[in-house]
């Protein structure tokens, strides 16, 4: 925020607001190096959100997190979405795609196979590859 010319007082207000919206107030003065991996993931999302992006790209944002950490990160992602930021996320987690996705772009071997609403993809995939993936028959 400082690089964007935001004053110190405005920066602090914006940081406090984002920490509050993400439930991370207790980490306001904690050095990132002492946080767990899951806490670092949550803080990284909060930092990105503080910039008020129109689009946020997330690559496997919950990889290597335990279920509680995954749930917490997904809650922050949902809050960011509800604030109007478009999220583009890669995931191999079908449950996560179902919970967070409104549109699915299904790729296989670098090629776009399907682009559709999430509900349509999970209920009626338009391709045999999409169906095989949902059935667990397509591993890579």
Regions found by a protein language model. Give the residues of each.
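H-loop/switch region of ABC-family ATPase nucleotide-binding domains
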Residues: 91-92
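Conserved catalytic motifs of ABC-family nucleotide-binding domains
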Residues: 52
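Conserved ABC ATPase signature
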Residues: 31-35
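Catalytic Walker B motif of ABC-type/P-loop ATPase nucleotide-binding domains
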Residues: 56-59
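Conserved ABC ATPase "signature" region
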Residues: 2, 9-27
